[in-house]
Design a protein with these regions (language model features):
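Acidic, low-complexity terminal tails and accessory targeting/binding regions
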Residues: 2, 86-97, 143, 147, ...
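Short, hydrophobic/glycine-enriched beta-strand segments
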Residues: 3-9
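Generic beta-sheet signal
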Residues: 4, 147-155
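Active-site metal-binding loops of divalent metal-dependent hydrolases
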Residues: 10, 157
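Phosphate-coordination/substrate-recognition cap region in phosphate-metabolizing enzymes
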Residues: 38-106, 240-245
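Glycine-rich phosphate-binding loop signature in dinucleotide/nucleotide-binding domains
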Residues: 45-48, 137-149
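Short glycine/proline- and acidic residue-enriched helix-loop micro-motifs
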Residues: 104-125, 222-225
């Protein structure tokens, strides 16, 4: 079971201006966003990542660069169009306070499965291609690096919310109940029977429990169970810290 860490890009210049950026060019992290990306990179530094996959948009590339810079190893970096921002079409580049007056706004809020942006894509199509991309990448990474592999997908708010909703078995019409902040960390572990959502929209906390255990030489090594922990379980075992000299 590989593990994917979903990271939303840090705060962007469009976020600060109250603009729905979509896929328009020229949107990058602002000063706060760069600091957020660096902080998230430091938080993930304890976890040896095998790959950092990013949306092709600049704000995500900048966030991915900060995560890679904090790694002691050299995780592979790649771009995945399947996790790019929703194509908001004619809504792109417009002020959110203006868009809130549009009839479609209420549909986006209450029945997103029926929302299709004029000149763009539907939210159902966005979820379908994002979930397919994450699951495909996860399976490929596990096949290459083994079930203990941990990787990062740097993407966008609505995209990450839709992936989390799928993992939780939620209908897309309920996905607005999920909140995903800039530079936040959410964690999913896919298995043959079900996905496990290990964390959602976190900003702090130790992540050393994601570090894979040392490889065993025995061919009889047990694969991690895909069963849920009835009663909740004891939680992850922390990685012992190195003794101080």
């Amino acid at each position: 079971m590989a593990t994917v860490i979903l990271v939303r890009h840090g705060r962007s210049t469009a976020n600060t201006a109250g603009i729905l950026a979509g896929r328009q060019a020229g949107v990058s992290l602002d000063d706060v966003g760069r600091g957020q990306a660096e902080s998230t990179g430091q938080r993930l530094a304890v976890v040896p990542l095998v790959e950092v996959v990013t949306s092709p948009l600049e704000r995500c590339k900048q966030t991915a660069a900060a995560i890679i810079a904090a790694q002691s190893g050299k995780p592979r970096r790649s771009t995945e169009r399947g996790i790019t921002e929703c194509d908001y079409g004619d809504w792109q580049g417009r002020a959110l306070k203006t868009l809130a007056k549009e009839p479609l706004w209420k549909v986006v809020q209450t029945q997103p499965s029926a929302a299709a942006f004029p000149g763009g894509e539907s939210m159902t199509a966005m979820q379908a291609r994002a979930v397919a991309a994450v699951r495909r990448r996860d399976a490929a990474i596990e096949a290459e690096h083994g079930p203990g592999a941990v990787w990062v997908a740097v993407s966008h708010g609505d995209v990450i919310k839709s992936v989390l909703a799928d993992a939780l078995g939620m209908h897309l019409d309920l996905f607005q109940r999920i909140h995903v902040d800039p530079a936040s960390v959410s964690i999913i572990r896919y298995t043959a029977t079900r996905p496990f959502v290990m964390a959602s929209n976190t900003h702090a906390g130790d992540l050393s429990w994601l570090v894979p255990p040392p490889a065993k030489t025995s061919k009889s090594r047990k694969r991690a169970s895909a069963d849920a922990a009835v009663g909740g379980g004891a939680g992850p075992s922390p990685v012992p810290s190195s003794p101080h000299s």
